[in-house]
Amino acid sequence: IEKKQLKKYIDINVTGNDELLQNALEEKADDRLKNIVATIQDEQNKIIRAKINSPLIVQGVAGSGKTTIALHRIAYLIYNYEKEFKPEEFMIIAPTKFFLNYISNILPDLGVNNVKQCTFEDFAYDVIGKKLKISDSNEKLVIIVNKEFDDINKGKIDIMIKEAKYKSSIKFKKIVDDYLLQIENNYIPKNDFYFKDYEIMSYNNINKLFKETYKMYNYNDRIKEIEKNLISELKKKSLLIIDDIRKKRSKELQNLTGENRIKVFDKYEKIIKLLEKDYKKIVKQYLNQISKKDCIQYYKEFIDGYLQNSDEVMIYLKKNTSNNLQKNEISFEDLAPIMYIQYKIFGIKEKCKIKHVVVDEAQDYGEFQFDILKQILNSNSMTILGDIAQGVHYYRGIENWKKFIDVEFKNVKTVYTTLNKTY
């Protein structure tokens, strides 16, 4: 109230005492934002304010305000958890670039900046470290939708659907896990670490470091830790080794004269200087035995060499994926396994490390896509919004929320709610 005139009102039954939502009604906000905030319903508001720690899953019919909830939940969480989380540690995964353009205009008006906004494909590029050629999912969708009118290729299309579903499943992830275990068992050199004739560390001890001591790290970071251990061990033993080398040199030089004596002396001196000055080089020579592949090469090896032709779906999967990889092309469903291989072997960049993710139109993603998000989050802090009835890429997506929760959040307290009213 200003000069006995009502200038503004706020329904505290909806917005409560949060300055964030109240400020969103200030004059600087455009009419679109005011309309959004003004129409938030009580049931939507309860979802917006749900605690951050548990996974929140919202099944909402068309027009129930899922996107409004997604945007306001991000704003609410950032404001109320500002001491625990930075805005850049939040991420919204949207289905299309068009949708991203829409929310990028709304979030700043809610006082939200620096939140990562991307499609699943964009996030995959960040995790993998390079942009990949992805076949158009819409072309596949057109083929699948027209299946009933294509009697000739109906059987092949059915297998295509099963392949996409299988690649997006937790079952496929478990096969990738088995493959990664095989890589882990063969990752480090099988030989002991020696300097000349001197054992510095046995294979068994190095393997124990790799598989037990540093198992919490990705494979690449484990090697970095092992490198430190090997350098340290080499330094410890270097004085004794140098002393022994000098004794050998003296013994060998006793019966030599002239040029032969100089050659032998120089040979031993070179070894001593290497040991005194270049521990890293010696250790690197040992670790250079480790295979130099990237995540795409590992995925090719997985498809071509590890997967078994157990049934017609797997035969099609192997052939189709292998042909695409030879053309440097992948499908959307290949992103999750490639991301997973990258994450487990090489880790991810700092910019990919997030603490809470909001996924809109979640019904179009499969179990494997959600599982890799959980791995990267290293927690269950997710807001998942979708509508099973509105699945566009239903052939690879979620069919049943209960089954999805049982797979992805088993033994985890999960908040599941439905919005059945269109506003």
Q: Model-predicted segments: where are they?
A:
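Conserved lysine of the Walker
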Residues: K66-T67
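Alpha-helical nucleic-acid-binding subdomain
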Residues: I78-V358, D364-I372, N380
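Post-Walker A alpha-helix
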Residues: A70-L71
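Pre-Walker A adenine-sensing motif
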Residues: A38-A50
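Pre-Walker A (Motif I) flank of P-loop NTPase domains
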Residues: I52-L56
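Conserved RecA-like helicase ATPase core segment
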Residues: I376-Y423
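Hydrophobic anchor at the beta1->P-loop junction of P-loop NTPases
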Residues: V58-G60
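N-terminal accessory nucleic-acid engagement/regulatory domains that precede
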Residues: I1-N23
